[in-house]
Amino acid sequence: MEYGLIGAKLGHSYSKIIHEMLCGYKYDLCPLPTEEEARAFLTKRQFRAINVTIPYKKLVMEYCSYIDPRAKAIGAVNTVVNKNGLLYGYNTDYLGFAHLCDAHGVDFAGRTVLILGTGGTHNTTSAVARDKGAAKVLTVSRHPDPETGELSYAEAVRSGAQIVINTTPAGMYPNVGVCNLDVAAMPGLEAVVDVVYNPDKTELILRAEEAGVPVAVGGLEMLVAQAVYAAEYFLDRKFEDAPAEIRRITAALRRDTLNIALIGMPSSGKTTLGKLLAKQLGRTFVDLDDAIVKADGRSIPDIFAAEGEDGFRAKETEQTARFGKENRQLLSCGGGVVKRPENLRALHQNGVVLFIDRPVEALAVGGSRPLSSSMAALRTMEAQRRPLYRAAADAVVPNTGTLEDALRAAMEALDEIFDS
């Protein structure tokens, strides 16, 4: 192996995609489940340069002949370069986190900062916060140690902090939807930063957005940035414009991996348009109504007849949560998916949402749709749901002409979203 990543579990890593997109060299994922395997790998030194992830960022320091002062102070190495058999260790997580905060205007000067978690990434983010002038850095733990001044999550809410940084795995794929801090009860917050990058927006970030926190950002750009700075060490050269490379690759990753969810009234064209979009964009097409029927074994009219709308909505929420946390899908949603806030969080956590807007006069009446029994019912429904569709959507796609027109409008909307 020339270049690659070592760690205990690498199943969901984006590092291979990032490095090969960045520099074109072959980048291998090398899972080493045990410490014994990691030590054997490092002893052999059969690589040019590697990245290191949990749980080996401290262990690798034992094998380094040189450790960058910043990495030594943090107590973790995530980038190792083999120079004629001698290993040189660096910490580009620091650089990646600093870039993320700078790029999104997080101002640490004079601020009180809460860091959720006590693991290795705590030290990295704490170093950045202190170096950028934070007045106070507080640590939050589920099991706080009073002797070290750690806070509980309940105490953290009352801390008066302006900045929150999550370094725990709370909300990380596949265990999404977890949020341990009540950010809505912290009115003075200026920024919430989560180092988790899958999903794109954790529950913490989604709730921060809902609470109106000015800056709420996940960790994907940090991941890309640390890879760019690691590649500079790998190749012993600087990129002419590293921030531009980081923006380019972050946008490309989102374009490649994020789900696209279509919302709108029944018979507005979500399924037909969705299948065309899925084919054009290389996404797996999923009709959530079909997923409900497949999981339940009954038709939608039969579910409504037996359990009413509430019973159907509960099943809809289950399937939205199931598919919403995955990647590279085109989700055609039922017309009422916007009625539950938890559904919108599930769609936004790893995707962009398009409202397919078709005039109510052009919608189909009756058929297998229990709530679309007449044009009068459709008009009432449309009046109730239109504000919800608009509030939930990242963009509106008019479907008033040909299918080709709608497809073109959808692609233009996606280009604008991913390029912004």
Show the residue positions of the predicted features.
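A glycine- and Lys/Arg-enriched "phosphate-lid" helix/loop adjacent to the NTP-binding pocket
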Residues: 349-388, 395
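ATP-dependent small-molecule kinase phosphotransfer cores
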Residues: 290-348
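Adenosine-phosphate binding glycine-rich loop
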Residues: 31, 195-258, 399
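NTP-dependent small-molecule kinase module
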Residues: 244-256, 276, 280, 326, ...
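Phosphate/diphosphate ligand-binding glycine-rich loop within oxidoreductases
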Residues: 2-104, 199-201, 205-207, 211-217, ...
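Rossmann-like adenosine-cofactor binding region
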Residues: 148-216, 337-343
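Glycine-rich adenosine-cofactor-binding loop
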Residues: 7, 89-94, 101-102, 106, ...
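NAD(P)-binding Rossmann-fold cofactor-contacting core
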Residues: 131-149, 289-291, 295-296
